[in-house]
Design a protein with these regions (language model features):
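N-terminal module of bacterial RNA polymerase sigma factors
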Residues: 1-31, 38
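Sigma70-family region 2
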Residues: 41, 54-69, 89
Length: 180
């Protein structure tokens, strides 16, 4: 924790800020990319959202209160940016977020950055049927292998509530996979 506080101090100090922010990007670019990609599913869109996420992190570092881990705070920003991006994209297209997500899933097979097979496409279709919060919880637990405590910090939900949502999501996905 002391090490994180020192790093945050470097991020806020004008003399060390650039070097510290470069380290932050190097350390967190891959996990944040993967997290955002799990939400928006498209490589190019993920790159755009990731860039916006780092801009927002940089702009808001002075407001970071240290009530959660830096990692959790950045994940929360990335999650909000990804969800906002999807809502804006759906609004621009004049369709619902669910319809947009189904279109993106249909395009996954043509995405050169997606190396999944038929089963993974089916899994993504099942996930798309879940409510937004269950999707997030499932993806963070299943794909990113985050602990419930970390997800709780990121989403601001109790661990018990997360476990229940994850369990319900798993049951819905199992039912979809069995019937399709």
């Amino acid at each position: 924790m002391q090490e994180e506080q020192e790093f945050i101090a470097q991020l806020l100090n004008l003399k060390t800020q650039n070097q510290a922010f470069q380290k932050l990007i190097v350390d967190y670019q891959r996990p944040l990319y993967n997290h955002i990609r799990n939400i928006v599913l498209n490589h190019d869109d993920t790159d755009d959202v990731l860039q916006n996420t780092f801009i927002k992190i940089f702009q808001n570092l002075k407001n970071f209160k240290g009530e959660s881990k830096l990692f959790s705070w950045m994940y929360r920003i990335a999650t909000n940016e990804a969800l906002s991006f999807l809502k804006q994209k759906a609004k621009k297209s004049g369709i619902s977020s669910e319809t947009l997500q189904n279109k993106v899933i249909d395009n996954l097979e043509a995405d050169i950055f997606f190396d999944g097979n038929e089963i993974q496409i089916k899994l993504q279709k099942a996930i798309a049927l879940l409510p937004e919060k269950q999707q997030l919880i499932f993806k963070m637990k299943y794909f990113e292998e985050l602990k419930y405590e970390a997800i709780s910090e990121i989403l601001g939900t109790s661990v018990g509530g997360l476990k229940a949502s994850y369990h319900i999501a798993v049951k819905k996905i199992e039912a979809f996979v069995k019937t399709n």
